[in-house]
Every structure is written in C-alpha cells, then in structure tokens.
C-alpha cells in the first residue's frame, strides 16, 4: 500500500486525476438551494468546477428543475468557462410522470429527464424500514387528489 498517498493532503491531487477532470462533464451534481441539506450552492458548484477545469456540470434536484437557474448562471457567469445544465426530475413535486413538466422543461433548455427516484414505488419499498426516510426525502403531507 502506498502510505504516502494516504498521508497526502485532501487538497493535493495526483496529476493524473487533475488531467482526467480537465474538460470533463459532471452529470450529477446535487447543489442547492434545495429542501434537502446541500454542501454548496449552484454558484459555488460552478466556481469549483471552473477551478477544477471542468467543461460542464449538470445540476440535479429531486424537487425541481434547475434549468432556469442554469440559464442565469450561464448568462451572468460565463467568464468562469463552465456550461451549467439541468433537467426535469419526474418526482411527485412536479406531478410524477408529467408530460407537461417535460415539455416545459425542454422549452426552457432542460437537457435530461430523470424518471422518478425517491417517489417511485421501488425506492419507497426499498426504504420503508428506514424511519428517517421522510427526513431524508421530504414528502407532501396530503394527497392532492
């Protein structure tokens, strides 16, 4: 085992790793604001991506499309040289499998459509034993229909 790698500072990157991220695209960035706690906000994510040399970042939130936010980031912070993208998450917050959300998202510039994640039957069934599930994935209190 290479103990020097373990002892290296977290801020020191192996040059091979740095070369890999140059021009890369992060396809799954959970920045904020969000109803769930996030480590950094969308602008901080853009700045960190710029510093790392990434070409683009795709922002994902389980509750809303960040596409309008990416439009503003790209317009006002183009000097950072990172293209910010987003898509449409088809969880309950946007009506689930909602063709209208997809159509409007695409018109706004969405680049990806995510099938339901935390609101899918499979995800709920998998996590039903977790008593903190609704803390991790906030849910609506009442059915709409």
How should these model regions be labeled?
Residues 2-83:
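An N-terminally biased module of ancient metal coordination in phosphate/nucleic-acid-related enzymes
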Residues 31-33, 90-93:
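Short histidine/acidic/glycine/proline-rich micro-motifs that form metal-
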Residues 80-83, 91-145:
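Extended substrate/RNA-proximal surfaces in nucleic-acid metabolism proteins
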């Amino acid at each position: 085992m290479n103990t020097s790698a373990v002892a290296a500072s977290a801020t020191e990157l192996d040059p091979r790793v740095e070369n890999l991220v140059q021009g890369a695209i992060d396809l799954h960035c959970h920045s904020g604001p969000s109803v769930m706690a996030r480590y950094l906000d969308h602008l901080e994510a853009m700045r960190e991506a710029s510093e790392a040399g990434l070409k683009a970042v795709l922002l994902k939130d389980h509750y809303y499309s960040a596409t309008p936010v990416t439009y503003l980031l790209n317009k006002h912070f183009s000097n950072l040289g990172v293209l910010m993208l987003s898509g449409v998450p088809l969880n309950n917050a946007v009506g689930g499998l909602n063709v209208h959300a997809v159509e409007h998202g695409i018109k706004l510039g969405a680049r990806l459509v995510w099938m339901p994640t935390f609101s899918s039957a499979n995800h709920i069934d998998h996590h039903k034993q977790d008593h903190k599930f609704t803390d991790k994935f906030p849910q609506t209190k009442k059915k709409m229909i």
